UniProtKB/Swiss-Prot annotation:
It comes from the Eukaryota. The modification Phosphoserine is found at S695, S700. Belongs to the V-ATPase 116 kDa subunit family. It comes from Bos taurus. Residues 413-414, 476-549, 609-651, 765-785 are vacuolar. It is found in: Cell membrane; Endosome membrane. GO terms for biological process: cellular response to increased oxygen levels; intracellular iron ion homeostasis; vacuolar acidification. Highly expressed in lung, kidney and spleen. GO terms for molecular function: ATPase binding; proton-transporting ATPase activity, rotational mechanism. InterPro entries: V-ATPase_116kDa_su, V-type_ATPase_116kDa_su_euka. This is V-type proton ATPase 116 kDa subunit a 2. The gene is ATP6V0A2.
Length: 854
């Protein structure tokens, strides 16, 4: 848990890898995921690095594997995924694996090419068969003829499509037949008419069934056409037009006998092609099935091998070119494991000289590593979305685990809605190992990754719903109301009590639609409800007034407490980075400013709750009036909340006023004094460095007289940038801006926490409206068919509840809770200017086969 409170302590290590063992050592490091490599060749182009040839080889293997997977998927062969990830292949097996894959690719491409050629021929023959069958009915040929030229005979009794008649017209007759796409028929016919000027006769017929296109493989509707034309020039034009419209043109037989012979030959060839094609497909499937057994492991191995060579390209060679030098960031807790990994890699490679490491001092800021598990990962992602934490600063995710779902539940508080959300999240948690959940769509995967956040959000919503006594907009009477209506009747009191108090009788009850319970009447109010809000408030006409007052005060208390806690966490940062002057000159004035104004407001709210009861509530002073009078230095007309209130309030205002100049000028003046004081001891300006720690700029002395900080810059994780001179103006302006932002932020952020009240009220009112418009109407149906009406009403109510109150309202409360943490809470102590620790780990490669192919 200490790691979750603050990031891991990191160190910079130098690895000395022998050339013969570097590959195996990085393979072991990739399996363990211990270190993050630094690029020592930033000025070298990626095409000029040492292992660029090996990287290209891996890319070629990836291309081959992608082709194999494409063919396997096309054949509908299942791709098995291994339960365990295979290790990176040894170097001596890489060439063998490359030869096997290349040989398999060549064989597959050849078989696939032959298969496609056979399939195309088969489809063309099938089209030819259909064309012959359909065109047989187009025209009649009474006798076989040869084209000749004759005189023009009379045409009164001749059929237009009789070929003997056409022959006698004195022109040379030709035919073009084939198939055309259904969508191109009209344009095709218009083009023929315009180009051929009417010297063609086109006849169409639609095929009964769609056929597969031999070129594209798409199944479409086809039209069979037969074009009769006169003259060779017209024939050339017709053929060119057919080519432009991608028509499938086939030879047209001149005689019925020729048609019969062609048809018989086509049937024989089609049967032969079917037989050959089936055998080819069977052989291809056998090859693909055999390849599918090992393709998963090959893909993982190639990806690991490529990652290793990318890391090797980030290393530099020594002067002898026999040793690779790498610089890595490593958690100090994993240094022993790092040494063991290097020893294991050297042993597996069989090298005589082992690889080794040593730590080196550095003044650079290390990356941030916060170890998480499946429960804390979601909350850490919420924090990292704002900004990765600076090195070694307090991590808000530890507290977000509780505060985030709690603030969400304050806005979403409903026992019924929270219980439904809890059940949904619990279902995801119990089935978290189900493979379909990890491979689901993006929205469902988002819910799955945040299942523990949803679980706590639902659980806290149940808790706040019990406090609000709100279950689907209705109150639950678990312990019995503590308000007694019968005690308000005059018959239950003595005559003396009746004269002193306003009591009820039958006449008052009949003539007044609204009656008020007086808690000062004995027996009316019997103490507070054991847990949550009394259910009788659900019947009161002033229910909203009471709930608004309660939720508004609760929001203010929670908000100020949340922000004060953030300022206190900043003190832990200053202590850790040895900036103790920041505690006295920044954190304490901020706390005094916050507590003397807004902390006192919380005190007045709680004091009024404790001192004034229901019986004395009429004499209680208004907190709003008292708080305004505090700043106007006005005396209270009601005598105040407690004796000596004016003196206490003036003291608090005095402390608030005095804390502002300290907050504005304290830190810059102290740094100026520190700078001049150290200069008097003989340390020049060059003895100072400007330490950029997150977004702050502080000046510290690095000379031998530095007693407090000494040489702890490495421990503090500060990025040091040498500065030529001490710029007091820049430091002063930075601190003034920060102070103004904080003082104004205390007011605006406190008002921002009122969204807890606003969204809680909106959720409750929307839930109440939904109940009144649906369930209230459905439950009042008292006819014999009431059940039949109620069932669809309940179903519609459930659907609207899920989509509106759970999803839409839940998303709204979720976003507002994120806003409260990012802006109002984290800006009090969290800088978030770090870089995330990204280790060289094979686990970061996708474990799902479908993603590996992308």
């Amino acid at each position: 848990m200490g790691s979750l409170f603050r990031s891991e302590t990191m160190c910079l290590a130098q690895l000395f890898l022998q050339s013969g063992t570097a590959y195996e050592c990085l393979s072991v490091l990739g399996e363990k995921g211990l270190v993050e490599f630094r690029d020592l060749n930033q000025n070298v182009s990626s095409f000029q690095r040492k292992f660029v040839g090996e990287v290209k080889r891996c890319e070629e293997l990836e291309r081959i594997l992608a082709y194999l997977v494409q063919e396997i998927n096309r054949a509908d062969i299942p791709l098995p995924e291994g339960d365990t990830s295979p290790p990176a292949p040894p170097l001596k097996q890489v060439l063998e694996m490359q030869e096997q894959l290349q040989k398999l690719e060549v064989e597959l491409r050849e078989v696939t090419k032959n298969k496609e050629k056979l399939r195309k021929n088969l489809l063309e023959l099938i089209e030819y068969t259909h064309m012959l069958r359909v065109t047989k009915t187009f025209v009649k040929r009474n006798v076989e003829f040869e084209p000749t030229y004759e005189e023009f005979p009379p045409l009164e009794n001749e059929s237009l499509l009789d070929y003997s008649c056409m022959q006698r017209l004195g022109a040379k007759l030709g035919f073009v037949s084939g198939l055309i796409n259904q969508g191109k028929v009209e344009a095709f016919e218009k083009m023929l008419w315009r180009v051929c000027k009417g010297y063609t006769i086109v006849t169409y017929a639609e095929l009964d069934e769609p056929l597969e296109d031999p070129e594209t493989g798409e199944v479409i509707k086809w039209y069979v056409f037969l074009i009769s034309f006169w003259g060779e020039q017209i024939g050339h034009k017709v053929k060119k037009i057919c080519d432009c419209y991608h028509c499938h043109v086939y030879p047209y037989p001149n005689t019925a006998e020729e048609r019969r012979e062609i048809q018989e030959g086509l049937n024989t060839r089609i049967q032969d092609l079917y037989t050959v094609l089936h055998k080819t497909e069977d052989y291809l499937r056998q090859v693909l099935c055999k390849a599918a057994e090992s393709v998963y492991s090959r893909v993982i191995q190639v990806k690991k091998m490529k990652a290793i060579y990318h890391m090797l390209n980030m290393c530099s060679f020594d002067v002898t070119n026999k040793c690779l030098i790498a610089e890595v960031w490593c958690p100090e807790a994993d240094l022993h494991e790092l040494r063991r990994a290097l020893e294991e890699g050297s042993r597996e490679s069989g090298g005589t000289i082992p690889s080794f490491m040593n730590t080196i001092p550095t003044k650079e800021t290390p990356p941030t590593l916060i170890r998480t598990n499946k429960f804390t990962e979601g909350f850490q992602n919420i924090v990292d979305a704002y900004g990765v934490g600076s090195y070694q600063e307090v991590n808000p995710a530890l507290f977000t685990i509780i505060t985030f779902p709690f603030l969400f539940a304050v806005m979403f508080g409903d026992f019924g809605h929270g219980f439904v959300m809890f059940l949904f999240a619990l279902l995801l948690v119990l089935n978290e190992n189900h493979p379909r959940l990890n491979q689901s769509q993006e929205i469902m995967r988002m819910f799955f990754n945040g299942r523990y956040i949803l679980l706590l959000m639902g659980l806290f919503s149940v808790y706040t719903g019990l406090i609000y006594n709100d279950c689907f907009s209705k109150s639950v009477n678990l312990f019995g109301s503590r308000w007694n209506v019968s005690a308000m009747y005059s018959s239950s009191h003595s005559p003396e009590e009746q004269r002193k108090m306003v009591l009820w009788n039958d006449s008052i009850v009949r003539h007044h639609s609204v009656l008020q319970l007086d808690p000062s009447v004995p027996g009316v109010f019997r103490g507070p409800y054991p847990f949550g809000i009394d259910p009788i408030w659900n019947l009161a006409t002033n229910r909203l007034t009471f709930l608004n007052s309660f939720k508004m005060k609760m929001s203010v208390i929670l908000g100020i407490t949340h922000m004060t806690f953030g300022v206190i966490l900043g003190i832990f940062n200053h202590l850790h980075f040895r900036k103790k002057f920041n505690i006295c000159l920044v954190s304490i004035p901020e706390l005094l400013f916050m507590l003397c104004i807004f902390g006192y407001l919380i005190f007045m709210i709680i004091y009024k709750w404790l001192v004034y009861s229901a019986e004395t509530s009429r004499t209680a002073p208004s907190i709003l009036i008292e708080f305004i009078s505090m700043f106007l230095f006005l005396a209270s007309d009601t005598g105040g909340l407690y004796p000596g209130q004016e003196h206490v309030q003036r003291l608090l205002l005095l402390i608030t006023v005095l804390s502002v100049p300290v907050l504005f000028l304290g830190k810059p003046l102290f740094l100026l004094w520190l700078h001049r004081g150290r200069s008097c001891f003989g340390v020049g300006r060059s003895g100072y460095t400007l330490v950029r720690k997150d977004s702050e700029e502080e000046v510290s002395l690095l000379g031998g007289q530095d007693i407090e900080e000494g040489n702890n810059q490495m421990e503090d994780g500060c990025r040091e940038v040498t500065c030529e001179e001490f710029d007091f103006g820049e430091i002063l302006m930075t601190q003034i801006i920060h102070s103004i932002e904080y003082c104004l932020g205390c007011i605006s952020n406190t008002a921002s926490y009122l969204r807890l009240w606003a969204l809680s009220l909106a959720h409750a009112q929307l839930s109440e409206v939904l109940w009144a418009m649906l369930m209230h109407v459905g439950l009042r149906v008292d006819t014999a068919y009431g059940v039949l009406v109620l069932l669809p009403v309940i179903a519609f109510f459930a659907v609207l509840t899920i989509f509106i109150l759970l999803i839409m309202e839940g998303l709204s409360a979720f976003l507002h809770a994120i806003r409260l943490h990012w802006v109002e809470f984290q800006n009090k102590f969290y800088v978030g200017a770090g870089t995330k620790f990204v280790p060289f780990s094979f686990r970061l490669l996708s474990s799902k086969f479908s993603d590996d192919l992308a």
